[in-house]
Regions:
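Conserved DEDDh/DEDDy metal-dependent 3′-5′ exonuclease domain
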Residues: 2-8, 16-17, 22-113
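Conserved Rossmann-like nucleotide-cofactor binding loop
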Residues: 13
Length: 113
C-alpha cells in the first residue's frame, strides 16, 4: 500500500518552553488539496495524532519534530506512531546557503506573503 501524505501545521500560544495552549491544528491530504480540515477541540486533535491517518499516511510539516509534535505531547500527553517528514531540516540540507529557513521567509521569496 502506498502511504498517503498528510500536510499539517498547528498554532499555539508560545514557544515550546512556555506553551500553555494549542489554538488549532490544520491538515490536508496531498491528493485532495482543496479539502483542509481545522481542529480546535483537544479531543479531536488527540484523535488525529493517536488514531488519525497514521496507518496509511506520512505526516509532513515544517519543524514538526522540533516544535509541533513535542508541543502536542506537552499539552495533550500524546505522541504519534506515524512516519514523519520534517521540511525544516530538509531546507537546511537542500538550501545550506540560505540564512533563514522559516515559512515566512519562503512565503516572501515566492510572493505569497
Amino acid at each position: 500500500m502506498v502511504a498517503r501524505e498528510v500536510i499539517f501545521d498547528m498554532e499555539a500560544d508560545n514557544l515550546l518552553d512556555n506553551i500553555t495552549k494549542i489554538h488549532c491544528l490544520s491538515y490536508r491530504y496531498v491528493d485532495t488539496p482543496n479539502e483542509v480540515t481545522t481542529l480546535t477541540d483537544y479531543s479531536d486533535i488527540k484523535g488525529f495524532i493517536v488514531d488519525g491517518p497514521c496507518e496509511d499516511a506520512v505526516l509532513i510539516g515544517h519543524n514538526i519534530i522540533g516544535y509541533d509534535l513535542p508541543a502536542i505531547d506537552k499539552i495533550l500527553g500524546v505522541t504519534t506512531t506515524c512516519k514523519t517528514i520534517d521540511t525544516l531540516p530538509l531546507s537546511w540540507y537542500l538550501n545550506h546557503g540560505r540564512s533563514v529557513h522559516g515559512l515566512d521567509s519562503y512565503g516572501e521569496d515566492f510572493g505569497v506573503l
